[in-house]
From Swiss-Prot:
Coiled coil: none annotated. Residues 1-37 form the signal peptide. It is found in: Periplasm. Its EC number is 2.8.1.1. This is Putative thiosulfate sulfurtransferase. GO terms for cellular component: periplasmic space. The gene is rhdA. It comes from the Bacteria.
Length: 320
């Protein structure tokens, strides 16, 4: 028997092993693997002076996402276009308040004068910062690279004595190419597979998290989730009345301590979930873009979708 004939069975066996390994890797669903690819986008929380210094920059587009149009009419940042955060969501044939498809999101951004290559500043006002953080998340999801959230919101900007106006800006609609980066989020099938493996953060009020407050089809939370109500990330409950502001973030050192006390550390695969995906957007942005946690995703369907499924529900306060 020749040397060549001896090698051939070994080569066949080696190739068979390689083929088996490749087949196994291809068979593992990609969504079971934590998202480790860094976003190309930059999301900042910027001071009012940052915004005021850039009002004449034509590459800066400003979105006022306040829900009440009269609030915008009464006064807004110069150049700001009002499109309420509620406009970005609606029914999907089964669930309410779901994010529109990429084409509709692109149309909304384009009508507001935003293109994919612009720097976009988002701000809101009122009881929470969540409208601004939701739209900032949607801009990132849609492929915008440079995004800023106005830290302190419209109130903080106005209180700083910076310029506001009642004039409506004249602008042209822009071309916004639809994009959709699925690496930033998980769906309900992924949630089912990742429960008990990933770290779920739920920023809803404790009464909703525990199931005490009966709002949904089923009430409670995803088993093992950590309850970190979103206002704890802001100055919403500052003991000094003059400093209370649900649009103003606490120092990053305090945010990091809040997370670490709940066992939410940078080595974890973190999924943020809430009622409708809106509350989750704040902690998603803070963890990913400010604290630089490498593996953070958002469950957009959140409890609206989960409560309508037959997946397990846990009640009571979290165990951490």
């Amino acid at each position: 028997m020749s040397v060549r004939s001896l090698r051939w069975p070994r080569q066949k066996a080696f190739l068979a092993v390689i083929s088996l390994v490749v087949a196994v890797l291809l068979a593992v669903p990609g969504w079971l693997t934590p998202a480790t690819a860094a976003s190309q986008a930059t999301v900042q929380f910027v001071a009012p002076t940052w915004a005021a210094e850039r009002l004449n920059n034509k590459q800066l587009k400003i979105l006022d996402v306040r829900t009440n149009p009269l609030a915008y009419i009464e006064g807004h940042l110069p150049g700001a276009v009002n499109i309420a955060d509620a406009a970005y969501r609606g029914p999907n044939g089964f669930l309410p308040v779901q994010i529109w498809d990429p084409e509709k999101l692109a149309s909304l951004f384009g009508r507001a004068g935003v293109s994919n290559n612009d720097t976009v500043l988002v701000y809101s006002d009122g009881n929470d910062v969540l409208g601004a953080t939701l739209v900032a998340y949607l801009l990132e999801r849609s492929g915008v690279q440079n995004i800023a959230v106005l830290d302190g919101g419209y109130k903080g900007y106005k209180d700083a004595g910076l310029p506001v106006t009642k004039e409506y800006p004249r602008y042209q609609a822009a071309r916004f190419a639809p994009k959709d980066n699925r690496a930033f989020r998980v769906d309900i099938k992924q949630v089912e597979q990742l429960t008990g493996k990933s770290t779920f953060v739920d920023p809803r009020p404790p009464a909703l998290f525990s199931g005490e407050q009966q709002v949904f089809i089923r009430n409670g939370h995803i088993p093992g989730a950590r309850n970190i109500p979103w206002p704890t990330f802001t100055e919403a409950n500052n003991a000094n009345e003059s400093l209370k502001n649900p649009h103003k973030l606490k120092p990053l050192s305090e945010l990091k301590a809040i997370l670490e006390a709940k066992g939410v550390t940078p080595d974890k695969d973190v999924i943020v979930t809430c009622s409708t995906g809106r509350e989750a957007s704040l902690q998603y942005l803070v963890l990913k873009h400010l604290l630089k946690y490498p593996k953070v995703r958002i469950y957009e369907g959140s409890w609206t979708e989960y409560s309508a499924s037959n997946l397990p529900v846990e009640t009571g306060p979290d165990r951490v």
